[in-house]
Amino acid sequence: EMIKYGSNVVGGVTPGKGGSKHLNLPVFNTVKEAVKNTGATASILFVPPAFAADSAMEAADAGIRSCVAIVDGIPSHDMIRIKRYMRRYTKSEKMSLVGPNCAGIISPGKSMLGIMPGHIYKEGRVGIISRSGTLGYEAAQQLKNLNIGVSTSVGIGGDPINGSSFRDIIGKFEE
């Protein structure tokens, strides 16, 4: 769906499957290898909860700037471990992590990093931030019905410990 929406998907990472292709895109063994070969700056995690913390930290170490963790059920202690790990980076180096248990990020008419139904969004000037994917979709659809568009919609996730708070995302909207 991200490719259909126009997002610039450059490859994937699956340890042990480097050198293969999926959806006609290269697959790499590590995020570092993917970044080196593609210049990727964003990542999306579609991994089992037990591997999510290591995947997020690997993305940060590889220089990924924005990461979306779609996966739900990441143990709270793993999210705490990720947040502590991220303290090693300066503010300008720190990866932005959205999720877990989220729908992702969409800027209508531009790009999507997630699993949102792109057809319900109209391009515009209103920002949406939601813990619930479904409520975010409903807000976007109601705005569209009123002919009001969305600049960006961010689903920060419904798990107890998130990578980004409402305050963090409002700060990004203000930048």
Positions of predicted regions on the chain:
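Catalytic-core regions of core metabolic enzymes
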Residues: 1-175
